[in-house]
Amino acid sequence: MSVPVTLTLIAYNQENYVREAIESALAQTFSPLEIILSDDCSPDQTFAIMQEMVGSYRGPHRVHARREPVNVGTVQHLINVSRAAQGELVVIAAGDDLSYPDRVTALYEAWAESGAAAMASWHDEIDDHGTMLRKDVSFPQSDVVQKIFAAETHANRNNGVIETVPGFCAAYPRSFWADLPDPPGPLLAEDGFASAMIILRGHKIQRLPRSLIGYRLLDGSLTVRTGGLGVAEIRDRERKINFRARDLVRVMNFTIDQVGREGLDIHPRTMMWFRNARNHGMVTSDFWEIGPVARFVRLFRIRIWDDARFLMPRLFGFRLFAALRRMFKK
């Protein structure tokens, strides 16, 4: 029997939360439903928990688990799992978030009516214990996104606003990811890439004004900022900046390459934004791994204010940078 929707739960190193996330996936009211539990080669017990829960499941959904042989990153993971999916619509769930029972139903019904290239929804914020922190949160629209794509007259707009898709609450037609070429290496910022491609194709992103997931806020999340001012906290924040910067370079390269492969009509101003973003990643990545001379050489790569704002306080070493940060944040 064919299924119209696949709910894919993707996880990496989430053994403390994945069981609860899977339980919420299995509790979906939509039927017939395929559920794929997919692990990105976690070194912890994430995949073992997936296998255990598939083995013990007795219910109406078609459920199976898969594992990447090596860690491939979010974009390749979504490409692979979409190629394996049977549903026309692929609903994405993270291994530490909770999908509410009617999530798949609500997304599928809205998508069947609109034909959007991506779906998303409001969400509730929960802590690591599952305690409610905030209800009915709409992921904010980015003023920067509006500036980046301002010249794209064919971009789909909702009351004049260009929508983006928050990856943690997203759903896509299976073909969106399945038809992409494999990226040359691991990419993590899948929602930035997806939003850019959908906008440049002139397709629609639809957000449902109701909470369909419990989005878990964790200290280690890429979307949660650490605010401590101790040396250890500052070093940790710098590591996260470096991590994001490396990914930014790879994602922008893949995006620019895909725009070229598809022959999309992109305004020169938009392409300038893309290239400046890639350059910013090159300016900020691996900064503390290079020597003092190489740090000063990066001054010649400054293209935008954000490049200078990153470089200037860091040029004279980490100790002075940490002292300045503590001084001006008090």
Question: What does each model-identified segment do?
Answer:
Residues 156-160, 166, 187-188, 192-193, ...:
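C-terminal subregions of glycosyltransferases and related glycan-biosynthesis enzymes
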